[in-house]
Amino acid sequence: MTERTFSIIKPDAVKRNLIGAILTRFEQNGFKIIASKMVRLTREQAEGFYAEHQGKEFFAPLVEYMMSSPIVVSVLEKENAVKDYRTLIGTTNPETAEEGTIRKDFALSQRENSVHGSDSIENANREIAYFFTDCEIFER
């Protein structure tokens, strides 16, 4: 079944000019990019996006990191998009990520791990709606 998932190219990757390399990986792995834009998160946006982590020790540093540079948010589409995207990006910790995954190849650390990906269809839908209106998403 064709699904949509949500992606963020995070500040560490944007600062190192890896946007093109990462978007190319998406397309090489069968994903259609049906929406994409560069944004600079406000504190309110970053805190809202990561609200489920509020009160945790890593919340404040995560918010600061996500505000440190523009990010690229995208909506990707393909069969089994959520699962396949999670496989493509690899585990959160790049040291344990499989060879050939985006995080193994590009991430600097567990926090500066280059990309975010939705972990369920429900979260993908919520995250897509957080950043995109329906008129910004295009069928291809």
UniProtKB/Swiss-Prot annotation:
Catalytic activity reported: a 2'-deoxyribonucleoside 5'-diphosphate + ATP = a 2'-deoxyribonucleoside 5'-triphosphate + ADP; a ribonucleoside 5'-diphosphate + ATP = a ribonucleoside 5'-triphosphate + ADP
A GO MF term: metal ion binding
Protein name: Nucleoside diphosphate kinase
Broad EC category: transferase
Role according to the record: Major role in the synthesis of nucleoside triphosphates other than ATP. The ATP gamma phosphate is transferred to the NDP beta phosphate via a ping-pong mechanism, using a phosphorylated active-site intermediate.
Annotated residues for binding of ATP: 10, 58, 86, 92, 103, 113
Family recorded in the similarity comment: Belongs to the NDK family.
Superkingdom of origin organism: Bacteria
Transmembrane regions: none
EC number(s) from the headed UniProt entry: 2.7.4.6
Lineage: Bacteria, Pseudomonadati, Pseudomonadota, Gammaproteobacteria, Pasteurellales
Named cofactor requirement(s): Mg(2+)
Complex and partners: Homotetramer.
Keywords: ATP-binding, Cytoplasm, Kinase, Magnesium, Metal-binding, Nucleotide metabolism, Nucleotide-binding, Phosphoprotein, Transferase
Any one of the GO CC terms: cytoplasm
SMART domains per UniProt: NDK
